[in-house]
Each structure stands twice: as structure tokens, then as C-alpha cells.
Amino acid sequence: MAAFSSASSRAEQAQQSQILWGRQLVVSHACGECHGGNDNPAAAHWLDGMRDTITQQFPIGPFHTRAKNLTPDVATGTGSFTERQIFNALRYGLRPEETPDVEITSMVPGQGNFPLHPHYLAPPMPWVSWRNMSNEELYAIAAYIKRGLKPVSHKVQDSDGPPDFWASEYTVEKYGPYPAVPYPTANETGKR
């Protein structure tokens, strides 16, 4: 019984370490600047979504995007998504509510479980900058969002604009390849 208890304790410690790492990444990447609470996990509205329609609404052309509730509330936040759906949102920019819980192995629509008609997260969500983070880092963020936050019931108005509008903007030609090309390139120092 002691061996089981010890293994269980190690598993709990590993999960807690992953959550703490995810918290550090969320704070250091300033998720709270848009999603609520600035960079302070002790703030009253930490990551529970846009509350001020003037300062946290992002006008982009004729559309407006609004930062969502990231807490694990089932009705108004991320509670109905799996950690893999959150991972896919961070890696591929896919809206978790419109993407199945599957491992994606390609960024080409219709291949490797990538949706044929993808619906992307709206700008200014910086998923394009995050896509080259390690799997471990992205899953740590997902773990923090799912298991490290208390659920808060706070409905944020949906962003305006057709869901397929962003698909024409998120192309390899505009944002570069994933994964990033190997180091060094012709523009970098280093031994080849």
C-alpha cells in the first residue's frame, strides 16, 4: 500500500508542477491583459473574460473581438473543453468549441485531423506567436486553465465577424512554417 501511496503522491506532485509551470507561462505571456486581471492571479476577475466593453474590445476593420472567459466554468468558460482542445487552440489557433478532441498532425485543412474548414480564434489572440512553444509548455498552460483556476460564471459577448473570415489570414505564406525552420538559417550565426 505504501508503494501505491508514494506513486500517487508523485503523480499529484507532477500534476501540481505542471499547473504551476502553466501559471508562470500564463502570467509571463500577459494573458490577463486581455482575459482579465492584468498580470495578477490574485485579481478579482483573473482570466474570467472581458468586462469593460471600451478597453477590452478590439476593433478590427468592421469587426470587434472580445477576450473570452478562460476559467473552467462549463457554461461560460473553458469547462466543456478538454486539455487537448485548449492545446489545439494554442498550437493551431482553432476555436475549441468548433474543433473535436483529436490529435492534429498537419496544418493543411482536411489532412491529419486538421478541420477541412477551420474556424480560428480571432485576433489579437497571439496563437501564431505561441505555436512554436513546446508541447509540454502548451499542455502546462492547458492544465493551469483546466485544473488550476476556479470556475467563474461570466458570459462574454461573442466576437463579431464571420467565423471563416480569419482563415484567409492564417496562411504559411503570411506567418511562416510550423514547426520553425531548423537553426541556423542563412540569417543566423551558428555552425551548420
Each language-model region and where it sits:
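Mid-length scaffold segments of soluble, non-membrane domains
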Residues: 69, 76-82, 94
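Bacterial N-terminal signal peptides
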Residues: 1-3
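Short, cysteine/histidine-rich loop/knuckle motifs that typically chelate Zn2+
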Residues: 33
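Conserved hydrophobic/aromatic "anchor" residues
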Residues: 26, 86-89, 144
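Short pre-active-site segment immediately N-terminal to redox-active cysteine/selenocysteine motifs
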Residues: 27-30, 38, 74
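Electrostatic cytochrome c docking/interface patches
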Residues: 7-27, 41, 80
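Second-shell loop/turn segments in exported
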Residues: 21, 71-78, 126-131
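Flexible coil segments in periplasmic/lumen-exposed cytochrome c-class electron-transfer proteins
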Residues: 14-17, 36-65, 84, 95-192
